[in-house]
Amino acid sequence: MITAFVMINVDAARIPEAAQEISEIAGVSEVYSIAGADWDLIAVVRVREYEELADVIPNRVSKAKGVVDTTTHLAFRSFSEHDLDAAFSLGLE
């Protein structure tokens, strides 16, 4: 699984709407509003192939209403078992 963190600047009047629109894009697993940075939102994108990433970010996330600018960071490795636990969980207790 390829994981990317997309830092997003949004027109201040459109932050909630942009966050909702971005959260509904296939491949976007999470969207957070943030403070203390030069960005308004962070989206976590998880896809199987780089071709999907090359479509999701420039053609969908960047074109959501109100988005002004994006910067993308790719994850090389996860040091948390959270993702693995969730991936293999059957939901049985």
Residue ranges of model-derived segments:
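A compositional/biophysical signature of low hydrophobicity enriched in polar/charged and small residues
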Residues: M1-E93
